[in-house]
């Protein structure tokens, strides 16, 4: 069965001057335009293609990769706007339509927005919606077992709030990065690796950008030790240095830096002074 707005593996059944026809099952033959045909494609081969709708709303294949597919969230820029809605750049020749009824605010050309990509049930057209809350779910009790403290996840930064930044976790859940846990510049639309800090009773998820636990401390301690060996045995950042300076140099939080210093100090590998830390001679 052909899946619109997603990748499909289809067999080549016919070659014509303007491309290749692929077996689309119940949908009939699907055109792969000549611009995407390569010399290693032959009749009978199965190839992976992305299926979307052309200007006449017919299924068409491409070997290009869109920024996101149906069922995913993405940060997309508005290419142009008309009396029906906005058209978003998503990496394919035909822009993705977001009608006015699916916009939380009037989208403007050149601005970017978080949207969810779906197939419209009434028209069977690919569509974006900025009303994304309805597509975010709360984890079930069983799913919470896979979202334990320290679990690595992929996030899409959503929007700034008074507390920090909302984020979309693994294309499914809503999370929050607290302002006092952010030690690097981040912006709406950034895709980042993050870690589960806590699943609250209301199902909302607190996030951190720093891995936690003893192993992370040991891993960074070795990085810091190597830095000292490569820099004449000294680092001018101590446990009282500003968090921003620590992050700029090592991309870790001040808390992680202090833990690593403490570990190296307990192992009698460094001394701690007013001017930073130094290797024991």
In which residue ranges do the predicted regions lie?
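Single-stranded RNA-binding regions, centering on S1/OB-family and related RNA-binding modules
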Residues: 1-281
